[in-house]
């Protein structure tokens, strides 16, 4: 009896998080659920497994947010993390000569990339171009002075820049770290 009275509260809290989220986030989750149904009807095991893993990661992220709203940028970060996990697994399987598992992981990674490309977020190439412009401007501002990466991170307005560039702060940070050595040699 106690379990029945508590269960609706937990469900309502997670539903509130999803309704409190951005429209792009809600549309992406509903697209995943619809495609899961289609994959189940078509008996496409690889697509079904990949989408279930993605929905599971989304649900875990919603629980971890504890009432904060989610957006398409957090989905982008989550998809990036899932893709990097697949890449690591592929490298492990190649080292152990497990070609069957390599093909499975590659197929799941392709499915995740397809959904990642559908998000209304800037591409990695656009992010890299914007970061290059930003780092060039900071380099001319600094002149001959030696600049460290923490100073660059401090110069950036993290509240407005992700919305201007339509990307997540994590993607911007990764691009800055990647391009810092090339520009500030």
Curated annotation (Swiss-Prot):
Q: What family does this chain come from, according to its entry?
A: Belongs to the AIM41 family.
Source organism per entry reads Saccharomyces cerevisiae (strain ATCC 204508 / S288c) (Baker's yeast)
Report further notes. Answer: Present with 2870 molecules/cell in log phase SD medium.
Keyword entries, A-Z: Mitochondrion, Transit peptide
Upon deletion of the gene, what happens?
Increases frequency of mitochondrial genome loss.
Q: Is Mitochondrion among this UniProt entry's keywords?
A: yes
Q: Define the transit peptide region by residue numbers.
A: 1-53
What SUPFAM superfamilies does this protein map onto? Answer: GatB/YqeY motif
Primary residence? mitochondrion
Instruction: Cite a GO CC annotation.
Output: mitochondrion
List all disulphide bridges recorded for this chain: none
* Domain of life, source organism: Eukaryota
Location relative to the cell: Mitochondrion
Q: Which GO terms describe its molecular function?
A: carbon-nitrogen ligase activity, with glutamine as amido-N-donor
Short name of one Pfam family: YqeY
Give the protein name, as stated in the record. Altered inheritance of mitochondria protein 41, mitochondrial
């Amino acid at each position: 009896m106690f379990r029945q009275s508590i269960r609706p509260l937990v469900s309502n809290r997670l539903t509130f998080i999803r309704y409190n989220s951005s429209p792009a986030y809600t549309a992406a989750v509903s697209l995943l659920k619809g495609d899961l149904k289609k994959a189940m009807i078509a008996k496409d095991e690889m697509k079904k497994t990949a989408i279930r893993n993605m929905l599971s990661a989304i649900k875990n992220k919603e629980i971890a947010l504890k009432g904060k709203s989610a957006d398409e940028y957090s989905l982008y970060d989550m998809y990036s993390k899932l893709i990097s996990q697949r890449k690591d697994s592929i490298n492990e399987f190649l080292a152990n000569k497990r070609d069957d598992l390599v093909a499975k992981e590659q197929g799941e990674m392709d499915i995740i990339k397809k959904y990642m490309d559908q998000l209304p977020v800037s591409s990695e190439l656009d992010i890299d171009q914007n970061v290059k412009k930003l780092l060039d401007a900071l380099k001319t501002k600094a002149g001959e002075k030696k600049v460290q990466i923490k100073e660059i991170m401090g110069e950036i307005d993290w509240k407005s820049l992700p919305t201007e560039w339509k990307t997540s702060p994590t993607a911007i940070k990764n691009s800055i770290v990647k391009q810092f050595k090339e520009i500030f040699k």
